[in-house]
């Protein structure tokens, strides 16, 4: 047991041990023990408490040194049943504070006439960012000013969020809820224009630190995937600090001592434990884990799209917990219930209500679909519509207000759902209650006018007119310090986390080091004893080995771009929350990478130095190592700085590629400094590669063994250096070392400054078409038209086969990381019937999605037991996928096509080939109307949270894509998550209509309103742990399910107008089972309903007479040619509308071509010696290698993004993997050809190559094939690896290999015979041979070569092994390479599946 030190040791001598039944009064024992604590000094007293150990004795403990078991024991004692015990805990804490007369700090938030406007760009035509539109737009910036318009998000809103009260923020998507929350928390983007004022306790936002005073909980769940839930919360608790808790605790302790009050030991221990700052593990973390229901997954990692982790609902709760674990009592929470069931939402909101009412917290929460029970927990409501406040007053008066406006909430309708629908033009009429008066649409402005004229509006206006009395609040209510911790504590916290992340990513670092070892082994054997002979030729080989080492270390830094970008989202969030300053994050990430650089550089030096044959002196060995180390550090620092400045993957890729190009071009090896144009010579001194070359060459060529004098009266070493222009004297080594250290310091300083001052990446700017903008402007002045019923045209009816899915005793097991087997589903039996809409419900973590995945066949791991039948026959996944549709919880779509195109693509590939195009298009149109997407059918889908559709639009698109496939069976995983009540009702009406056509439909659902819940016909209810609690019909008004549960002894009756779904989840949750002392799963198995269901399932599992097993004449609905055409059409749209992908490639090759042309200006016309030919070869090498590297890098992210879409579409049997892969391959051809043409047109005349059509064609052909090869190799590396990080690490090795065996750093003739096969396998060797041989293989001009006279063609054959007669073979190999690599890409895409489900 942890102790406080000497004082506690003395106090322990007074500890009273007591046994049960010893006759001493418990209160006297407690007072006696408490007296020992009271004797301690003040500081020790507030960190010392009594902890009951469970054996009728108490120990004196130091709360700063509590062990995990002790913290959890205390929390379990305080909060066993969350709803009741949390309230009791807060009341006890408040009672203790009130007993000594301490007033807690409170905050009142006011906003007056608050307006927010955003600028958007107006374009003519459709606002789609195609390649042509982007080029046109970029050019127009220089010709004319772009047209912009302003969109009002919030329009003069005013209100008060009061302490001690819970306020609900309601409104449809797009009404400005998120903007209002961000404005109140001081977190609005700098790109928007803000008017009006916001104040806390009468102080404007500029007078204090609002980000620390209030806590804003975003809709986006951004977490570090490698950290567990507990680690995430512990870090947040540590960084947010304790606020004024310690000061309050000291004052409580002082006053209690004066009044001789003995507090409850458990309450005292808890309050003291959460009042200690900077702890690695916090008691507050255990408390938040408990009340948010995250204690069951506390040690599970957060995970992400590519790594397994917690569920979506748990991630949403983690986002909430990360903020509320801090000391702030002003909470602004944005849609915290997404992905949560209604029972869990009620529990969390109930805890927040208790915090507001008892602790005086100020809480404003926006919710999309609050259940009636959750809605009743709020004190006030702010109703937003069209950026304006319609109602801002007590919740209890809101129905009365709308009745006064002529609208009444129906009896079995949730008030929150009614409030969101009553503002809708399409839904308003059904709530009109003045039947004697004709209905006409009442606009938002009319509601606002009525509210302002009401007594409620008058009271709000009157309160706002009175200034806040600052004398009535505590000084510490507001925060005036940016950071809670000292600089040292912040650095320690960030360092601890960085070390943990490095441990979690150890496989990636080991993988990188393993590849480095492989590269080193290859390099040392390629350059085996290259330095054994000291002459100009072998000196050139040694230079090549040095360049290879430096290039490998340069490429080794490239993955740092992706790693840094991947963490920037979480960093930006935490920086905005003032968890820590940028330097506290930067310093650990810089320093802790140094040991890895030391290891990698040392491995390379140890393996290669003596084998290659460098100077054998030990001192020179270590000096060689030091240069490699400082260069490696400078490269990693440079890429880190680039990532912190550019912030997006596309910008980082192009900037990183340009940086590598510049470093190599001006590094002194590709083109010697002496050969560079004078006016570009300054570039040499700005390249870290130059200084690394200077350092390595000075270390080697000024060594004693290179001091042999040559005919020119200079040493052999100086002769080699003179040829390369690197002879800067013996002491240039230390100059180079100092320069490299300077680069390391400069880039790391730049990285830190960019993190500090660079604005966070924002959501892409809005673009609106000119026509749409004019339409919006005109509608502002048009009267609202009467609602007229639209004549319904005949619906598109497509044939389908009704199918029943039965499942008996289904069990599912997975293997845990510890090697144990864990069962997730227990003996699940049921049936999904045609024409029946089935709801699959349960609390978060009950196994709903797991069961849906098992039934649909989406699981890629684990063991499934039991029987699943379709139409009475055993399920065959290949045919089942053709007749079923699956709407995923996470909306995965191709980002660069429109909404309508997404549906057309799905219909094209999934509907039978005999259905004509007209029928398909009519079906697409009908589905668009059904899910109300017709208004945005021409909108780009975009990336979630970055561009394109909103969450609810994306959700409707997911459903629409499946509906157009005309499936017999539809699985929907949480189709209403992220939707408001109206959108959810629209979606569920569409789903119900689909079920009524005779299709089999099942969907999981978390927070159904009464209306939505009662649209279902049957219910499958699961409890936590994957066990079945109920399967059967709902009945009218849920009568059958209510009757079943009410028949169980001890279950409370459902209240009038209560949502049966919420009631059902409440009574079957774990705490309710504990309270009732029963197991609902066992109760179901013992019921007659279970026996009846077993009989029904057995009957449905038998095939009917005359029926046949599901079969199709072909594996896919379309022919192979049809699949290829459809996939190619989508890939064309995706490429054409992705300028960030293709335009950057075009810009890079233009820049590369121009730079090479300027550096090698007209050098091809005057070849006099081997160095002139080496320089020309260097120009070819630069164009081929670096243009290829850039293409390879940029295509990888595109393929990785589209691969997730590919997995979804392949599962649906939309197409063959080969059709998808070859469409991806073919779409690259025109873009690569365009790049090749641009490169050839620029480079060929400027460098001065022979102006021959034949030679020019060879140049174009070689570059074109080279770009294709690199593109396809990038695709292949993505196909071979589970995530982009691994692919990028593999890319570094690939670059090193194609560089080493290109024939540039080591010619073919000198490559050892055991590695010559690698030369022939390297595509760059063939490309360079084709370029050089076609230009000079037939040139008979004599040149000076290492002191001899030889013809150019003879030198090419003698030194490089290039023959002009071999060009036919080269031409064949060049076209064979892309075909082979493309085929390998297609093969591995079809065989490998890294999706873990």
Swiss-Prot record:
Keywords: ATP-binding, Membrane, Nucleotide-binding, Repeat, Transmembrane, Transmembrane helix, Transport. It is found in: Membrane. It comes from the Eukaryota. The keyword Transmembrane helix applies. Gene3D superfamilies: P-loop containing nucleotide triphosphate hydrolases (3.40.50.300). GO terms for molecular function: ABC-type transporter activity; ATP binding; ATP hydrolysis activity. SMART domains: AAA. Confined to roots. The chain crosses the membrane at residues 507-527, 549-570, 594-614, 625-645, 651-671, 735-755, 1141-1161, 1173-1193, 1229-1249, 1260-1280, 1286-1306, 1314-1334, 1369-1389. GO terms for cellular component: plasma membrane. ATP 2 binds at residues 842-849. Residues 138-411, 805-1050 form the ABC transporter domain. ATP 1 binds at residues 171-178. InterPro entries: AAA+_ATPase, ABC2_TM, ABC_transporter-like_ATP-bd, ABCG_dom, ABCG_PDR_2, P-loop_NTPase, PDR_assoc. Belongs to the ABC transporter superfamily. ABCG family. PDR (TC 3.A.1.205) subfamily. This is ABC transporter G family member 41. It comes from Arabidopsis thaliana (Mouse-ear cress). The gene is ABCG41.
């Amino acid at each position: 047991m942890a102790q406080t030190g000497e004082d506690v040791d003395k106090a322990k001598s007074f500890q009273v041990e007591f046994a049960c039944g010893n006759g001493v009064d418990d209160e006297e024992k407690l007072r006696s023990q408490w007296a020992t604590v009271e004797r301690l000094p003040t500081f020790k007293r507030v960190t010392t408490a009594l902890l009951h150990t469970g054996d009728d004795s108490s120990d004196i403990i130091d709360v700063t040194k509590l062990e995990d078991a002790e913290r959890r024991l205390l929390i379990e004692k305080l909060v066993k049943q969350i709803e009741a015990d949390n309230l009791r805990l807060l009341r006890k804490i408040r009672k203790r504070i009130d007993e000594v007369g301490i007033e807690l700090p409170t905050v009142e938030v006011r906003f007056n006439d608050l307006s927010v406007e955003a600028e958007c760009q107006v374009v003519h035509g459709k606002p789609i960012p195609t390649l042509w539109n982007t080029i046109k737009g970029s050019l127009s910036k220089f010709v004319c000013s772009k047209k912009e318009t302003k969109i009002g998000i919030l329009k003069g809103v005013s209100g008060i969020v009061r302490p001690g009260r819970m306020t609900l923020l309601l409104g449809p998507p797009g009404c400005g809820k998120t903007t209002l929350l961000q404005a109140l928390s001081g977190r609005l983007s700098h790109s928007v224009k803000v008017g009006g004022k916001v104040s806390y306790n009468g102080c404007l936002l500029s007078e204090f630190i609002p980000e620390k005073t209030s806590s804003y909980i975003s809709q986006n769940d951004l977490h570090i995937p490698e950290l567990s839930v507990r680690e995430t919360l512990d870090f947040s608790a540590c960084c947010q600090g304790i606020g004024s808790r310690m000061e309050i605790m000291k004052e409580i302790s002082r006053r209690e001592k004066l009044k001789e009050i003995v507090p409850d030991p458990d309450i005292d221990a808890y309050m003291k434990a959460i009042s200690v700052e900077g702890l690695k593990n916090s008691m507050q973390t255990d408390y938040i884990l408990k009340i948010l229901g995250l204690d069951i997954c506390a040690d599970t990692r957060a995970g992400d799209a590519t790594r397994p982790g917690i569920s979506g609902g748990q991630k949403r709760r983690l986002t909430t917990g990360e903020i509320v674990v801090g000391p702030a009592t002003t909470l602004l929470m944005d849609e915290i219930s997404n992905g949560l069931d209604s029972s869990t939402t009620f529990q969390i909101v109930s805890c927040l209500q208790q915090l507001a009412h008892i602790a005086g917290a100020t809480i404003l929460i926006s919710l999309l679909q609050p259940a009636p029970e959750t809605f009743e927990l709020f004190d006030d409501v702010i109703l937003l519509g069209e950026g304006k406040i319609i109602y801002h007053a007590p919740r209890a008066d809101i129905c009365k207000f709308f009745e006064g406006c002529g609208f009444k909430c129906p009896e079995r309708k949730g008030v929150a759902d009614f409030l969101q629908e009553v503002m809708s033009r399409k839904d308003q009429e059904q709530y009109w209650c003045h039947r004697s008066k004709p209905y006409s649409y009442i606009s938002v402005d009319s509601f606002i006018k009525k509210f302002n004229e009401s007594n409620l509006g008058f009271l709000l206006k009157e309160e706002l007119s009175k200034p806040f009395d600052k004398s009535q609040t505590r000084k510490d209510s507001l925060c005036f310090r940016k950071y809670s911790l000292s600089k040292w504590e912040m650095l320690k916290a960030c360092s601890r986390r960085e070390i943990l992340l490095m441990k979690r990513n150890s496989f990636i670092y080991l993988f990188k080091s393993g590849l480095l070892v492989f590269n080193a082994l290859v390099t040392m054997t390629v350059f085996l004893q290259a330095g054994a002979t000291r002459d100009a030729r072998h000196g050139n080989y040694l230079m090549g080995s040095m360049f290879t080492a430096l290039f490998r270390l340069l490429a080794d830094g490239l993955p740092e771009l992706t790693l840094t970008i991947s963490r920037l989202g979480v960093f930006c969030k935490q920086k905005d929350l003032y968890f820590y300053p940028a330097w506290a994050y930067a310093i650990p990430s810089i320093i802790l990478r140094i040991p890895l650089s030391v290891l990698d550089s040392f491995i390379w030096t140890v393996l290669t130095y003596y084998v290659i044959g460098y100077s054998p002196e030990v001192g020179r060995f270590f000096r060689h190592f030091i240069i490699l180390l400082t260069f490696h550090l400078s490269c990693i620092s440079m890429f880190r700085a680039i990532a912190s400045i550019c912030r997006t993957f596309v910008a980082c890729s192009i900037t990183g590629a340009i940086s590598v190009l510049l470093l190599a071009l001006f590094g002194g090896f590709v083109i010697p400094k002496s050969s560079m144009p004078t006016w570009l010579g300054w570039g040499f001194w700005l390249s870290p590669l130059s200084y690394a070359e200077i350092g390595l060459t000075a270390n080697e060529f000024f060594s004693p063994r290179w001091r042999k004098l040559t005919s020119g009266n200079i040493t052999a070493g100086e002769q080699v250096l003179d040829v390369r222009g690197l002879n800067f004297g013996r002491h240039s080594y230390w100059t180079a070392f100092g320069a490299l250290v300077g680069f390391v310091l400069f880039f790391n300083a730049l990285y830190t400054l960019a993190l500090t001052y660079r604005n966070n990446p924002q959501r892409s700017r809005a673009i609106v078409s000119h026509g749409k903008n004019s339409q919006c402007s005109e509608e502002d002045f048009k009267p609202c038209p009467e609602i007229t019923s639209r004549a319904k045209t005949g619906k598109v009816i497509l044939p389908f086969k009704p199918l029943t899915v039965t499942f008996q005793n289904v069990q599912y097991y997975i293997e845990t990381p510890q090697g144990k087997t864990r069962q997730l589903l227990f003996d699940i039996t049921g049936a999904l019937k045609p024409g029946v809409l089935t709801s699959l419900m349960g609390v978060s973590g009950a196994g709903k999605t797991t069961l849906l995945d098992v039934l649909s066949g989406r699981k890629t791991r684990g063991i499934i037991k039991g029987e699943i039948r379709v139409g009475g026959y055993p399920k065959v996944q290949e045919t089942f996928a053709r007749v079923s549709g699956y709407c995923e919880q996470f909306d995965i779509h191709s980002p660069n096509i429109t909404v309508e195109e997404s549906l057309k693509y799905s219909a094209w590939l999934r509907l039978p080939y005999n259905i004509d195009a007209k029928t398909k298009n009519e079906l697409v149109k009908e589905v668009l109307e059904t899910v109300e997407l017709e208004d945005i059918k021409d909108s780009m889908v975009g990336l979630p949270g970055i561009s394109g559709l909103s969450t609810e639009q994306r959700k409707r698109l997911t459903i629409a894509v499946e509906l157009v496939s005309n499936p017999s069976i539809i699985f929907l995983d949480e189709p209403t998550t992220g939707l408001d009540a109206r959108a959810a009702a629209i979606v569920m009406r569409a789903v119900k209509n689909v079920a009524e056509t005779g299709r089999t439909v099942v969907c999981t659902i978390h927070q159904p309103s009464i209306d939505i819940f009662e649209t279902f016909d049957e219910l499958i209810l699961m409890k936590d742990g994957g066990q079945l609690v109920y399967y059967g019909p709902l009945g009218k008004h849920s009568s059958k399910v209510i009757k079943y549960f009410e028949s169980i002894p001890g279950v409370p009756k459902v209240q009038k107008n209560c949502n049966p779904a919420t009631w059902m989840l409440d009574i079957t949750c774990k705490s309710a089972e504990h309270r009732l002392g029963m197991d609902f799963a066992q109760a179901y198995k013992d019921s007659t309903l279970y026996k009846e269901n077993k009989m029904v399932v057995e009957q449905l599992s038998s095939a009917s007479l005359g029926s046949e097993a599901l079969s199709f004449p072909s594996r896919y609905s379309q022919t192979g040619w049809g699949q290829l055409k459809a996939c190619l059409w989508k890939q064309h749209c995706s490429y054409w509308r992705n300028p960030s992908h293709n335009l950057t490639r075009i810009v890079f090759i233009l820049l590369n071509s121009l730079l090479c042309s300027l550096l090698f200006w007209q050098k091809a016309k005057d070849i006099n010696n081997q160095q002139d030919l080496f320089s020309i070869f260097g120009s070819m090498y630069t164009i081929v290698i670096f243009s290829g590297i850039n293409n390879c890098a940029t295509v990888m992210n595109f393929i990785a993004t589209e691969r997730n879409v590919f997995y979804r579409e392949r599962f649906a049997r939309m197409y063959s993997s080969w059709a998808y892969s070859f469409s991806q391959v073919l779409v690259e051809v025109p873009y690569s050809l365009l790049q090749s043409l641009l490169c050839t047109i620029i480079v060929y005349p400027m460098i001065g190559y022979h102006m021959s059509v034949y030679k020019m064609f060879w140049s174009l052909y070689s570059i074109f094939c080279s770009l294709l090869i690199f593109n396809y190799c990038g695709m292949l590396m993505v196909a071979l690896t589970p995530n982009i990080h691994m692919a990028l690490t593999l890319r570094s090795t690939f670059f090193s290999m194609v560089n080493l065996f290109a024939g540039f750093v080591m010619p073919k003739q000198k490559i050892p015979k055991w590695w010559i096969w690698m030369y022939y396998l390297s595509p760059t060797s063939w490309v360079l041979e084709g370029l050089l041989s076609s230009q000079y293989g037939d040139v008979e001009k004599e040149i000076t070569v290492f002191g001899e006279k030889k013809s150019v063609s003879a030198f090419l054959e003698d030194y490089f092994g290039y023959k002009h007669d071999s060009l036919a073979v080269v031409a064949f190999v060049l076209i064979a390479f892309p075909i082979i690599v493309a085929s390998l890409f297609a093969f591995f895409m079809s065989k490998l599946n890294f999706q873990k489900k």
